[in-house]
């Protein structure tokens, strides 16, 4: 009997992670236009409205000015009613909590319209241990902001706008969401980013990364930066953009995720890119838990044969986003 107890103790000792009390998990997910169904006159949400609100001449004329045909058709014909919106919310929530049984400890979202829709998502996943959320309305006219949902208390948050160089100095873009969260009696910084899209000059993404570095240098707190960096494989291969961050940051997909193709698939170029990734600060007493960096892929958000993201289909009400979520576990030393 004593031998059994000893063996059980040794088995338990070696199975239970030594650092489990000092670990937390993160997920970053671009939710691809998560809008409510209400008209906000201060934001460009005209594509995401119920069809009955799209019948006026004013609305139709506004849509006809859109140059991209798919966006124009969406503006004219998409019926973004309450049921469709709820279907997207439920699909997102289902995939979030499918990670690690009850969802990540810290969830960073991009392309969230406002606090109203964020609160609705929070209410769906709150039973899984989430206690706080934050979204600060930015100047972005498109109405797609960054947000945090957390199982730990958010202490403070603010926005940092990015000043671009050269001919783009007057360009405005989405700011960096800076959030301080207390985890295991330690304060950590989280930077949620959504940098300029690929049709903008690459210098704007590099300026954004330099801004992120400057924020990190202003303090000594352990820090996590995550989100949609919008750096594609072509420009990264040429300019080593992610590699150049390693003086201050440990870049998730360069440190792990060995079998990951990317978080976004470009159909026209038939290529994968890590638009979305996770950084943690170097030499600040945090590191990645080995083998924890991955893409969170389910049968609902990725095709089984190709791994490509399944974007939300408002007719079938299936799918989640055109981006795959990246996840990691981080250890506080």
Write out the residue ranges for each language-model feature:
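Active-site beta-strand/loop signature of hydrolases that rely on acidic residues for catalysis
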Residues: 26-31, 75-81, 85, 92, ...
């Amino acid at each position: 009997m004593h031998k059994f107890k000893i063996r059980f103790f040794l088995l338990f000792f070696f199975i239970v992670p030594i650092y489990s009390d000092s670990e937390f998990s993160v997920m970053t997910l671009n939710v691809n236009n998560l809008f409510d169904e209400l008209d906000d006159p201060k934001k460009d949400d005209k594509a995401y409205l119920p069809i009955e609100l799209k019948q006026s001449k004013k609305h139709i004329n506004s849509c006809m000015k859109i140059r991209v045909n798919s966006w124009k058709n969406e503006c004219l014909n998409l019926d973004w009613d309450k049921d469709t919106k709820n279907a997207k919310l439920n699909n997102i929530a289902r995939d979030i909590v499918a990670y690690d049984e009850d969802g990540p400890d810290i969830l960073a979202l991009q392309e969230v319209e406002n606090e109203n829709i964020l609160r609705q998502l929070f209410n769906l996943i709150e039973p899984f241990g989430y206690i706080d959320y934050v979204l600060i309305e930015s100047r972005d006219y498109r109405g797609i902001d960054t947000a945090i949902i957390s199982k730990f208390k958010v202490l403070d948050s603010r926005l940092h706008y990015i000043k671009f160089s050269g001919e783009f100095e007057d360009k405005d873009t989405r700011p960096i969401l800076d959030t301080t969260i207390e985890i295991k009696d330690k304060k950590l910084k989280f930077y949620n980013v959504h940098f300029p899209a690929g049709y903008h000059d690459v210098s704007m993404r590099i300026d954004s990364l330099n801004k992120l570095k400057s924020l990190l240098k202003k303090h000594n707190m352990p820090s996590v930066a995550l989100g949609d960096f919008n750096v594609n494989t072509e420009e990264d291969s040429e300019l080593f953009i992610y590699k150049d961050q390693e003086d201050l940051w440990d870049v998730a997909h360069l440190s792990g995720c060995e079998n990951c193709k990317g978080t976004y698939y470009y159909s026209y170029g038939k290529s994968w890119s890590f638009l979305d990734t996770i950084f943690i600060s170097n030499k600040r007493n945090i590191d990645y838990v080995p083998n924890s960096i991955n893409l969170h892929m389910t049968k609902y958000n990725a095709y089984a044969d190709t791994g490509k993201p399944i974007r939300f289909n408002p007719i079938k009400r299936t799918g989640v986003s055109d981006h795959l979520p990246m996840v990691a576990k981080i250890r506080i030393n």
